[in-house]
Amino acid sequence: MIVFSALVPSSPFLFPSIGQSATDKLKATLQAYQELSAHLYAAQPDIIVVVSSYKTVEASTFFINQSPHYTGHVKEFGDLEFSFRRKGAIGFAHHWKESLARTSPVQLHTKQDLHPTISIPAEILTKPLPRVKIIPVEVADVSSDLHYQFGKEKNNAFASAQQRVAVCVLGTLSQKLSPDSPAGFSLAAKTYDTFMMSH
């Protein structure tokens, strides 16, 4: 059954040792994270599915990570002490993949080392739950219809599961607000940001 769901921003600056200079700007976000962490703890999930737009491979396939263990470091940001460690849920990941195989482009892979954009939010949210198992998922470069289908089938699989499942989607606001943006400019960017912040 699904016992918790959240859409949260993902940034290395959320971690105190990295984002010290931005702490004031991130105060509301960090407070919201702590509130979500408390709600997540109260839900007592067995498994947390972490859906991220970060990709280890550019592909038109959803990747479900079924590593037995996960680790995460932020050495590239100057913090040599931080170490994220959680167990995976291999059986659940495999069963979930099989239930999706006929309707969605999905594959299993095994990646133990997690990118900071995944490990840092996961660390903040699951700090009170050090024994909880996680399943990272990489979204695919596919149509919105296929994303909807994947989400619908995911919901059906989790709702009928005996395990208590939490779903955390990691995302960002638009990076196309300015003509000077490396990602380019989009007239829809502001509308997208407004919609996301209001929900």
Where are these regions (language model features)?
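Soluble secreted/lumenal catalytic domains
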Residues: 1-166, 170-199
